[in-house]
Structures are given as C-alpha cells and as structure tokens.
Amino acid sequence: KFNLLELTDGMDEMLGTFEMEAGQYNQLRFLMDMPELSQGPPSNPECYLMINGEKEPLFVPSGGQSGYKAVGAFQVPSNGTVELMADWDARKAVVETGAGHYILRPTIRLVAEGEAGSISGGITNIPDDASKIIVYAYEDGDYESAEADEPAEEESRFPDAVTSDEMGEENGYKLWYLAPGTYDLVVAKNVNGSFDSVLGIVEDVKVESNSNANAPIDISELSTP
C-alpha cells in the first residue's frame, strides 16, 4: 500500500516492472481495488482518505474495470528499458461530490523519467494575508482566466494545470517531472485555507531534459493574468 500524500517533493515508490512490445505508447491503465460509486460505500475500503481520523472510501469511475488512465507519450526501445514516472496531483485528483462522497478524477500523467526536467525558485513579496501560495505549471499559452473560476460539481479548480506545488517553509517551490517544453507559471493565493485569487503569471519558462530551470517569483512584478 502507498500513502500518496507522502510521495511529495520528488519522492517516489516503485510500482512494478513488466514487459511490453517495443514501440510508441500514449497511455497506461492502472487496475485499482476501488469501489464504483453505484455500489455504495464499502465496509473496509482498500483505497481511502483519512479525514478527522476516519476512513472515507475513495471512489474511482471504472477504476476496477477499464482501469485508471495515465496519459503521456513514451517509447519502449527494442531490447531495452524505459522508466516511467506516474505523477499524481492531489489538488486536482480528489474532489468531493454533492452527496459527500470522494472520487478520484483521472488526472494522473506519465513522463519518461530520463526525459523529465523541473522548475524551481524562491518566492518574494508575499502578501501578508496569504495562508498559502500555490504555483501551477501550464503548457505555454494554455492558461485562461476561467481556470480559476468556481469549479462545477465533481471538478477541480485549475483543471488544465500540468502540475502544482505549494510554497514551502523557506519560501520556495519546485515543480517536478515536467516534459521538455515551455511553461507558464500561474501564482495563486489562499486565505484562511481557501482559494482567494490569482496573483499573476510568470511566462515562458523553458524546461530541458534532466535539468532544472531556475525561475524566481517576485509577486510584485508578476504579469497580469
């Protein structure tokens, strides 16, 4: 069993190894021991959240039948191996339904570990009323202001973000396991534990394979979203 909330800040666990035919692939599916929402809450769920010391079952649509889809292009070489990272963002993946159930949305992504890069930096000029600063990575040009709107039921805010990170104790952030490319960083503020506003954007951060892009964030100089 894995506690996914412990696998943060670049920590990972091996899920397993298996053989595949050489070629290009675009997704994997994980068959998970999770109940269907139509089955009702199980008495002893294998996949669950701990809320106020109590187990709350975590449902996944078709997770035990068609599988939980992880998306990302990768190449399996002939007579070779490829290491994949399945990156899971709790801020997007877990949502509460109107009936008080928790479901796992299909937001996991795959990155070939040998190709992955990262973005990190310090954050300065933080608003006094901010309880949290969250940095979201978007593929270049993908962010629209509607991403920050109040989400519909069973949806999450910032749904098209590639990944995200919360500012740490030393006022820094790091966005792990990014495919090579250009990204925009959307900086959001939480007040008293809830989303408050988007503070601005850092545009055109370039990520290369096996390297870290340094992108310090001065909130007073952010571009207007």
Tell what function each PLM region has.
Residues 1-225:
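A short, solvent-exposed, low-complexity linear motif enriched for acidic/polar residues
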